Amino acid sequence: MPKNKQQEAQEKRLQKNIRQAKKTGADAKQGKTKSARSKPSKKGGFFAGLKADAPQTVQQSIPYREMYRDGICRLTDTLYTKTVQFFDINYQLAQADDKAQIFEGYCDFLNYFDASIHVQLTFINQRANMQDFTRSIDIPPRGDEYDGIRKEYGDMLKNQLQKGNNGLTKRKYITFGIEADDLRTAKMRLERIETDVLANFKTLGVQARSLNGLERLELLHSQLHPDGQEKFHFQWSDLPKTGLSTKDFISPSGLSFSKDGKTFRVGDHSGAVSFLQILAPELTDRLLADLLDLNDAVTVNLHIQSIDQAQAIRNIKRKMSDLQKMTIEEQKKAVRSGYDMDIIPTDLATYGEEAKNLLQDLQSRNERMFLVTVLVENIAAKCQKLFNDIFAASGVAQKYNCALKRLDYQQEQGLMSSLALGTNQIEIERGLTTSSTAIFVPFTTCELFQEGEALYYGLNALSNNLIMANRKTLKNPNGLFLGTPGSGKSFSAKREIVNVFLLTEDDIIIADPENEYGPLVQQFGSQGQVIDISPTSTNYINPMDINLDYSDDENPITLKSDFILSLCDLIIGGKEGLSPIERTIIDRCTRLVYREYLQNPCPENMPILGDLYELLLKQSEPEAQNIATALEIYVNGSLNVFNHRSNIQMDKHRVLCFQLKSLGKALKEIGLLIMQDAVWNRVTANRSKHKTTWFYIDEFHLLLKGQTGSFSVEIWKRFRKWGGIPSGLTQNVKDLLASREIENIFENSDFIYMLNQAQGDRQILAKQLGISPHQLSYVTHSGPGEGLLFFGNVIIPFVDHFPKDTLLYSVLTTRPDEVAGTKA
């Protein structure tokens, strides 16, 4: 039967496809002999384990030979590994652009590892000893009148601890291993890899540190003692004394595996290891984060083995050749049967397109191929809790179209592969490209739980964990409390004041323009003093007060003269300020007025404003008479409240509160400036005693204009050096950006406690601090005590709902209805 034109055309296409398939097959075969020789040997998986001698002791099960002091571990005759601990960054809260940048940086990080390096990422959520946590937040009694407040505050902290899951410690590690003939060769290469790994983490903005041998043993000990009760006791000097090996110091009391091959027992705890079967066509960066967000003891391990790029390309070409052969067979059938040869099984067409795209990714898009094993280890004190935890983890996997499969009869291999040693005994691997592997982003959100003199700042809104931080550890401990009226600014600052008072020996000074802090300071009894500054008050502050530590240099008069110039400028400067002649006269008289005090520094010789006034009258220049006349109302007139020697014993009280509400308009700005100088005097005196001074300024926007604004900028620049920690409270964010000089206050504040913000202020802050839209949602129509904490490079959303049924709450609150209820 003669062929029609369509059949002839199909046969020509078929012959062309056959020739193309042969060419692809030839490309795939190139280097086949070589790759067969260089193919790595099989790992010791389940069946290999059956053939080998079964371990008789726990020590024999732990798969390493020797741990060295520098952190290098020898697993076999030729395999050496090292471990680096890394810490979290705010990935989930970051802006979309920042997320993309972190993801791309992490892809580059993975691409660094070639086929000769095995990588293991270990994420450990482990139950810690609750007694240790409680001890770290405990405020011990001191046998004084404040123990009642200490107990109430301590009980509040313990109650907040119960709300969160601070019983879980979260740690992240990367272990990398290489093959080497001897330790010396391994050491050189591992140290080079370690340097590159740390540099790559630094590029990502991630803090990381290498573990030494002792720290690696402590890590293994914690993994093999999941209850956290047994402490790790080991020194290198113990080895020759006892004749034991390092394994003896980290091994649990017992290790057994169930007959059904599904669980194991380590010490008093039950556990099970599962592997993640990746079925989803597309993965999301939330999968790993959600697994680690489970409030359970879980360890997730990613074993990553890079494939040589040329080998990966050959493998794909070989697969494409196989697919083409299958396609040709289908096309032959179609031609023989007389139907269209383009009608082939859907799967063949799909697989062919996927293989083509994968080849293109490897050849032109900076992608590599990795073999990835994802292991999930659950551990619990009771079997029922273990099964519940596994069910919860399986639910997370199913949510993202994956499956969590138990490692039946491979629990021992799974457990050992979950230790941060860098060995994978499970031969269940999934091939993934760089971007598919990087979707398991190892970053979620930061936690902030410092020890020592750490203060309480609420609960992490994402994890419900306690936020405990020590501002003294910051490069710039200066702080700002920002929020709309009623958002909880004053309450938060007062809570911090109480915490500082109870936990430290530091001094606290409060600038209180609205007279809100008096009841709190009175709770501190003899250690607190409320100082009312007003025209009718009998509390006096001498603006001429000075101490010999007032300045860095040997002559404190230079800096004091600068303050008095600012004071006079405020009084008589007008719009144009003091003239050069007036400034010269004031500076001259300042130096003269302190001459007697410097010769004999006793309180009786401390000058007052009237002494400066008298000196000005004696000067010959007419400008001096003008200055004296302007000062007269503050010396002999109705505003002479600041023309007295100080009668406040500031150094006798730890907490001072300057109430400024009654000053009136005429004295308000002058009073604020004089108060700032009095605070500076206290800070400089405290520095010589090695004592920190905390300075809180409510309604901070009042001190951001004119001379007080300049003085505030100086405080923010210089206080840290003198042991001072200033904090400003304001709802007027725009005032903080009124000038480039005032804007420095923002840049010199590493602590920002941001509560609910008005619409205009939100946009300003987002631009100034680089806040993502998701982060901004935490300060948009948020409730009292809810917002964002900026602590150095860490940004954490917080919630602080202080218990209302306490004495402390009644003195901390500033809500009118609650204050009225307290008074009633």
Model-identified regions with their sequence ranges:
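P-loop NTPase motor domains
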Residues: I89-N90, A96-A115, Q126, D290-L292, ...
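Extended, folded cores of ATP/NTP-driven motor/assembly subunits in large transport
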Residues: P2-F443
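A short helix-turn-beta junction within AAA+ P-loop NTPase domains corresponding to the substrate/partner-engaging
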Residues: G525-I531, E741-M754
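Post-Walker A helix-loop "phosphate-sensing" segment adjacent to the P-loop in P-loop NTPases
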Residues: N499-I509, G528
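Hydrophobic anchor at the beta1->P-loop junction of P-loop NTPases
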Residues: F481
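Conserved lysine of the Walker
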Residues: K489
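Conserved P-loop NTPase
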Residues: L769-K823
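Hydrophobic positions on the alpha1 helix immediately C-terminal to the Walker A/P-loop
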Residues: S492
